[in-house]
Amino acid sequence: MQKTKEKRAILITGCSSGIGYHVAVELDKLGYQVIASARKMQDVQKLQKLGLNSVQLDLDDTESIRNAFQQTLEISGGSLYALFNNGAYGQPGAVEDLSRETLRAQLETNLLGWHELTTLVLPVMREKSEGRVIYNSSIPVSYTHLRAHETNDLI
């Protein structure tokens, strides 16, 4: 189900659960044209059943990022008021226990995926002389030792 009413369009990444899911639902209630993205198709379908516009977006995959961006423009009529970069993941384990490859994979998603999507979105926002790019990062409140995903907050 696609909502076509003219509203401020917001693309939100990582809407399968947690903050992304709740932000998408609440902004939709407030009247924004939400495009909720998720990596897995089953999550996209779950979001669509709620009445949200939803696209599949895997931040590790350039083709997926580009396809989701194009679908977002089709849904929104070519404009985008905001990008809410929320989709990410944390690799469990103590920093000293994680390999370079594991951390590289995490940075690929949590930094480079966001960057690639943002570089696609900015020209659309500049054309309209308005827009917002929001980066969200969260970590659990307490840990007994530093986890790899906590290092993202140090960057």
Question: How would you describe each model-predicted region?
Answer:
Residues 94-95, 102-104:
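Substrate-binding pocket helix/loop in short-chain dehydrogenase/reductase
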Residues 144-151:
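Conserved small/polar residues in nucleotide/adenosyl-binding loops
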Residues 51-63:
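Rossmann-fold cofactor-recognition segment
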Residues 16-17:
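Conserved glycine-rich cofactor-binding loop
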Residues 118-119:
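A short, exposed helix-loop element centered on a Lys and neighboring polar residues
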Residues 86-91:
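Conserved NAD(P)H cofactor-binding loop of Rossmann-fold oxidoreductase domains
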Residues 54, 98, 106-107:
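A hydrophobic alpha-helix adjacent to the NAD(P)-binding/active-site core of NAD(P)-dependent oxidoreductases
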